């Protein structure tokens, strides 16, 4: 199931309303969410209630998904790298059967990204499972956001083969990076990645440049995601407890990464480097969009004034 396009409208998210915090405080909370702090830690640090932070995440995530859809268009990308990163909701997939009160959507959850290798812009993202359908939706979305023929690089996940073919047909240069791994380290129950023992580049479609068949940039970005979103941090209890909020956080982070955060090597935002933005956005801009979507307050009952 794809959670990138959330079913609730902005009005549905926001119409419940709350006593508004000052804009500066709201911007601080959104910034801390994108700087790797958990919601509980933010509540302690800012003296803002946990429930208020959850509501702010829902509102911001919904607005940020819309802003990404509107602004990341007509991207002049020449090389796109795609990958998927693992996390889990409520509990890991292998423990769902034994978990107490596990939700229907508990278990593994995957975030797919397609990144412009030159500008480092996140062109497309998707939160869902690791199925072929998820790969198809990602590739279809990338196709709709770029302007010219592109070289695509992915890992060896078989789901990409049909997805790239279906989205681009023969109008693409596509290569895969196939990694070979050694034996799983012991003890098996302890987290530690297997050692990569070899890498093979495979031409799949068109005429990809072998020198640029690579997933290095998107893999570095995977680490950036884990650093900036607490729910992606391994070996902690900061994991997501609700899939919708996981998707909201990814949407908020994506706008932050593309339009707000200064990229350390580019010295500007990826959106500015890609030519789809001329200046930095701020969290205050996000808050303004949230407030603009809020329905007007209902008028109270009419009270006749008493004669003086």
Predicted regions and their residues:
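Residue-level recognition of single "structural anchor" positions
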Residues: 1-308
């Amino acid at each position: 199931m794809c959670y990138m396009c959330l079913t609730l409208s902005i009005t549905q998210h926001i119409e419940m309303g709350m006593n508004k915090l000052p804009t500066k405080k709201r911007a601080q909370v959104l910034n801390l969410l994108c700087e790797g702090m958990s919601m509980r830690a933010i509540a302690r640090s800012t003296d803002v209630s946990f429930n208020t932070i959850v509501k702010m995440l829902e509102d911001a995530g919904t607005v940020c998904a819309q802003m990404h859809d509107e602004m990341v268009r007509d991207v002049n990308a020449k090389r796109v790298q795609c990958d998927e990163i693992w996390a889990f909701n409520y509990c890991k997939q292998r423990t769902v059967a034994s978990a107490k009160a596990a939700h229907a959507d508990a278990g593994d959850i995957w975030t797919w990204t397609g990144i412009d290798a030159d500008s480092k812009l996140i062109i497309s993202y998707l939160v869902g499972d690791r199925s072929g359908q998820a790969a198809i939706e990602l590739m279809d979305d990338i196709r709709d956001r770029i302007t010219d023929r592109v070289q695509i690089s992915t890992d060896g996940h078989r789901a990409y083969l049909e997805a790239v073919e279906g989205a681009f047909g023969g109008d693409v240069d596509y290569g895969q990076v196939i990694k070979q791994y050694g034996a799983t380290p012991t003890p098996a129950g302890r987290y530690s990645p297997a050692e990569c023992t070899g890498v093979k580049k495979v031409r799949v479609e068109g005429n990809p440049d072998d020198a640029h068949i690579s997933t290095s940039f998107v893999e570095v970005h995977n680490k950036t995601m884990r650093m900036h979103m607490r729910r992606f941090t391994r070996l902690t209890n900061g994991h997501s407890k609700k899939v919708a909020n996981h998707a909201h956080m990814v949407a908020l982070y994506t706008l932050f990464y593309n339009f707000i955060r200064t990229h350390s090597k580019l010295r500007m935002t990826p959106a500015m480097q890609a030519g789809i933005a001329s200046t930095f956005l701020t969290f205050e801009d996000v808050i303004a969009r949230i407030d603009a979507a809020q329905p007007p307050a209902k008028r109270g009952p009419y009270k006749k004034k008493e004669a003086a």
